[in-house]
Amino acid sequence: MIKFLSALILLLVITAAQAERIRDLTSVQGVRQNSLIGYGLVVGLDGTGDQTTQTPFTTQTLNNMLSQLGITVPTGTNMQLKNVAAVMVTASLPPFGRQGQTIDVVVSSMGNAKSLRGGTLLMTPLKGVDSQVYALAQGNILVGGAGASAGGSSVQVNQLNGGRITNGAVIERELPSQFGVGNTLNLQLNDEDFSMAQQIADTINRVRGYGSATALDARTIQVRVPSGNSSQVRFLADIQNMQVNVTPQDAKVVINSRTGSVVMNREVTLDSCAVAQGNLSVTVNRQANVSQPDTPFGGGQTVVTPQTQIDLRQSGGSLQSVRSSASLNNVVRALNALGATPMDLMSILQSMQSAGCLRAKLEII
């Protein structure tokens, strides 16, 4: 009976633990994307391009491009173009990208163009931080937004000054890679955690032998690998598919001060406390009054005098009791019972943490 209970308890503990693959928790150091950027022109717009009188760089770029094609524009020519726009083009060079491989690009207007819908990006070199050209971009732009205007009225859905070209750039230069050089590789945790780093190292050592992996710090695990690209690929494939029991995360509440959004994980708990939140509202009313002379022939003139009225109201918040909560559902239910807006909730959570009632780290972004 005792053995059965022990086995049952062990089974419950193992079931409660959440297992994840090492590939979902880590990344290989040095295997990363690299940002590319370029400046180009979009043509073929339906009268929604840059106003060239206000964006002289668009005209200058067009003149330079035409001169490279053997077309000379007379000096002093004032070109009134509406179907051309100057844009910035960005892309990410993937790890192990090879010549001839295509990547997606994002096109964004940098002038006063109204829309890039229906436009075509002309050949644009994409450079890295070393000013070397790694890809060439060109193609038709796909804009996700929509808009129309007529008679002084307009309507717009989403953004029209940016778009995307799927497979719009071709890689022309490869980045040198250090993969396969040396007998060690570093795995980097997505989030720093000493216990998780040690647990991953222990899992690799159990399967590959003691000394195969060492946790260097809270984010880095050094792994001994065989030499050669093909051997390291097979070795990493086996390691990344190993299962690791994920320990509970640190309780954390993230507050976005710009949008007022509040996000918390399931480890957040509350202690018993009492909360009172008062609302302060300020109302400003401004009205223009017309003052005229009493008699039409008595002199004077008609003037407009503004009248401003400011009202200040503060509604007293009642003291609300918040019970101790051990689960995320209970925490959400307790906070909703306060009836506070997201902006009020930010102040309440900060005060709760200062009072020691919020058992979590508070991060404001």
Curated annotation (Swiss-Prot):
Any one annotated GO CC term: bacterial-type flagellum basal body, distal rod, P ring
Please describe the quaternary structure of this protein. Answer: The basal body constitutes a major portion of the flagellar organelle and consists of four rings (L,P,S, and M) mounted on a central rod.
Query: Which Pfam families did the record assign?
Result: FlgI
Against InterPro entries, the record matches this protein to: Flag_FlgI (IPR001782)
* UniProt-recorded Gene Ontology molecular function terms: structural molecule activity
Q: Where in the cell is it found?
A: Periplasm; Bacterial flagellum basal body
General function of this protein: Assembles around the rod to form the L-ring and probably protects the motor/basal body from shearing forces during rotation.
* Biological-process GO terms, alphabetical: bacterial-type flagellum-dependent cell motility
What family is it from?
A: Belongs to the FlgI family.
- Signal sequence span is 1-19
Q: Which UniProt keywords apply?
A: Bacterial flagellum, Periplasm, Signal
For this chain, the annotated S-S bridges are none
The molecule here is called Flagellar P-ring protein
Q: Which PANTHER family match?
A: FLAGELLAR P-RING PERIPLASMIC PROTEIN FLGI, FLAGELLAR P-RING PROTEIN
